[in-house]
Amino acid sequence: MDMMKFAPEPFKIKMVEPMGNLNKEERKDAIRTAGYNTFLLKSEECFIDLLTDSGTNAMSDRQWAGLMLGDEAYGGSRNFYHLEETVRELFGFKYVVPTHQGRGAENILSSLTIKPGDYVPGNMYFTTTRFHQEHNGATFRDVVIDEAHDPNAILDFKGNIDLNKFQALIDEVGAERIPYICLAVTVNLAGGQPVSMANVKAVSELAHKHGIKVMFDATRCVENAYFIKTREKGYEDKSIKEIVHELFSYGDGCTMSGKKDCLTNIGGFLCMNDKDLYIRATGMVVQYEGMPTYGGMAGRDMEAMAIGLRESMEYNYISHRVNQIRYLGEKLDAAGVPMVKPSGGHAIFVDARAFLDHLDQKTDFPAQALAAAVYEFSGVRTMERGIISAGRDIKTGEDHVPKLETIRLTIPRRVYTYAHLDYVADAIIQLYQMRRDISGLKWVYEPAVLRFFTGRFEPKNGELIKGF
């Protein structure tokens, strides 16, 4: 691999945290104690932690300095007004409602806009997003293009909405039963795949023609903007900031987890242009999150979010961010490790069904088994994103069976170097040579809701990796 393709990290390291790596027997005991669920491992038990990029970012010196400007007033914190001003400028929406994280924004949006019997279309489900939609009585309908479900389909914009599917849903149930379309930029479970600006425009036109709102899941919007700049004709000379602003000009609002592209450890917000929705949302924030000028966040964290959102739109940063993902993907792909292609904006998704093709998706849970095996073998923590994450149908109780059965190798922002990624790649490549020795799993405890967070399992064959 030509390292000249990959520029070094565009930052200097001012503070370090020691990393410990448990020995093999300690790792085997740790994953057993965690019920073979990587979510239940302790942080100190993980050598390299790729569980998520949510809230695991390294903040900059400017953000740390901003913490000292924290105004912790119960009402009217000046940090909120800085955040509000920043979001209005960069996103273009009229109203900003702070929440403790993206999940809080999802809850408010779903509670205020959905009524029982509604349908919410979107470009692939996300776990918590669909939960809030279904909890409030809606049915989620996937209207992403078919190629998004094919790990080997190579497209520049694999997260696009299929306009024919969207129109078919409108014809089937009526626009009055569709409060909004949830447009994720990027699409997490498709592999961090982006949506083109042309597709966003077309979706906006179709939705607004029928009186349907366009609500973005804006969590990784900066990564999406980078792909538009580098892949879509006519945007190569536009700044990331300009692209983000245009992107959101086609929508009516967004939910945002500040724990991703705001480069912070906590926080989120809900945006909208509808004044009535804003008034009702602030009322709900008071009930569940806090005052409308802090929404469950400390003032210092709102300040860090405002600074981080600007930093994330600096080209040197976002280029390095996406290239780290590409670097890891190219190493795995060159060794024949099956993965979702092309690599996305925040993670590499290893195709667990192809990796462990001796296991049955419905009864052996290959993604859950592979995530546990990667940890036991190397100390690297990853995340299951397959049938366990998909959960059960709220009406029938049957498992949702996703076409993609993956583990997610999620790269925290500004945390790991290329040397760390080399270790991850080498470990997974070695494990791939031992893949036939990995056992399937069975349930020991299945929670009723969002089961992937706290569910517990055990190997069907007694040991997870035979002879290891």
Swiss-Prot record:
GO biological process: tyrosine metabolic process
Catalytic class of the enzyme: lyase
Catalytic activity field: L-tyrosine + H2O = phenol + pyruvate + NH4(+)
CDD domains hit by this protein: Tnase_like
Molecular function terms, GO-annotated: tyrosine phenol-lyase activity
Quaternary structure (record): Homotetramer.
Entry protein name: Tyrosine phenol-lyase
